[in-house]
């Protein structure tokens, strides 16, 4: 039986094999966060409109689009949410084990731009010293920031 299954698999080839694998295995979203720092080492935090009121502060974050690199997701999300441009640097976190998502985080340096908020998603944006982070900061984001000090 295994031999027949292997022969059938080999006859499928390329894109058909990928479609079968996609249907057979878990599919998930990838949440991407950017730890954006300016020239003074301050970190960019956003007060997110759609997050629970007691923990609205967090890093710029969003979900990767199909065929988009995670680095491109960081750049896109920061630009969409704040109007700022960044240079994405290092992967600092990869977390799995969630039911429907994987989370990744990258460091990024501010390149330029003026803050122009996406008022649907973001209430405000501020730069914070890493030793003076606000109350209401998502705890997992606090941990990520501390990893990059």
Q: Where do the language-model regions lie?
A:
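A short beta-turn/loop motif at secondary-structure boundaries
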Residues: 26, 51, 94-99, 119
């Amino acid at each position: 039986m295994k031999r027949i299954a292997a022969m059938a698999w080999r006859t499928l080839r390329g894109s058909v094999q990928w479609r079968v694998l996609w249907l057979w295995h878990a599919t998930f979203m990838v949440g991407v966060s950017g730890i954006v720092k300016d020239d003074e080492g301050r970190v960019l935090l956003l007060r997110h409109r759609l997050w629970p009121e007691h923990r609205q502060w967090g890093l710029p974050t969003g979900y990767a689009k199909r065929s988009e690199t995670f680095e491109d997701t960081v750049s896109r999300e920061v630009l969409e949410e704040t109007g700022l441009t960044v240079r994405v640097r290092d992967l600092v976190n990869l977390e799995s084990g969630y039911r429907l998502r994987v989370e990744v985080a990258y460091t990024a340096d501010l390149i330029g731009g003026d803050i122009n908020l996406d008022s649907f998603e973001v209430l405000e944006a501020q730069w914070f010293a890493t030793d003076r982070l606000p109350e209401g900061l998502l705890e997992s984001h606090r941990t990520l920031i501390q990893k990059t000090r």
